[in-house]
């Protein structure tokens, strides 16, 4: 009962915050730069994505939790040709068999200007079936873009069992 109550409160907080645009925060950019260094340290082959992508969004810490109904959320920085151009908020609501909580990083690479512009306009949502590559040494060598986007995640902590459905939604706020 207590676990369900705590999970419900976490989900309610995440959902209430889901569509909130975030003002530019230099702390998030610093955290994103540190996350970029950690991605590269964990898998040096990911450097090619940072070098060749037109832009990318880096979410240094996404928190996810649930028990039956779940949610996730986190703030990140958006870069265009290596320069920070704005901030983003990711939110997700999931329904299905799930229990636990975890934190992770997420990097979304945009192959070209059109893909990044779609993200900035709000025309971007990761569907439930979108695939992300878990960053580990050499994993990004075999990864590629799908519809102009490549997604990588890096676990930070926690344990989550899930067989659930839910997509990620993003907001963008220019710098």
Where are these regions (language model features)?
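Sec/Tat signal peptide C-region and signal peptidase I cleavage site
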Residues: 17-23
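Positively charged n-region of N-terminal signal peptides that target proteins for export
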Residues: 1-4
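Small-residue-enriched, tightly packed secondary-structure blocks
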Residues: 23-175
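Bacterial N-terminal signal peptides
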Residues: 6-17
């Amino acid at each position: 009962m207590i676990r369900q109550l705590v999970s419900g409160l976490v989900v309610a907080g995440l959902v209430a915050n889901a569509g909130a645009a975030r003002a530019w925060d230099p702390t998030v950019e610093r955290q994103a730069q540190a996350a970029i260094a950690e991605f590269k340290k964990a898998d040096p082959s990911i450097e090619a994505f940072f070098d060749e992508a037109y832009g990318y969004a880096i979410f240094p810490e996404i928190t996810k939790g649930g028990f039956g109904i779940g949610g996730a959320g986190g703030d990140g920085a958006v870069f265009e040709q290596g320069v920070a151009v704005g901030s983003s908020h990711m939110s997700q609501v999931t329904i299905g068999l799930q229990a636990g909580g975890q934190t992770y990083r997420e990097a979304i690479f945009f192959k070209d200007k059109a893909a990044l512009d779609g993200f900035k306009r709000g025309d971007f949502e990761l569907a439930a079936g979108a695939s992300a590559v878990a960053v580990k040494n050499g994993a990004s060598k075999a990864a590629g873009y799908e519809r102009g986007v490549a997604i990588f995640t890096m676990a930070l902590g926690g344990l989550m069992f899930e067989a659930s459905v839910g997509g990620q939604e993003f907001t963008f706020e220019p710098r």
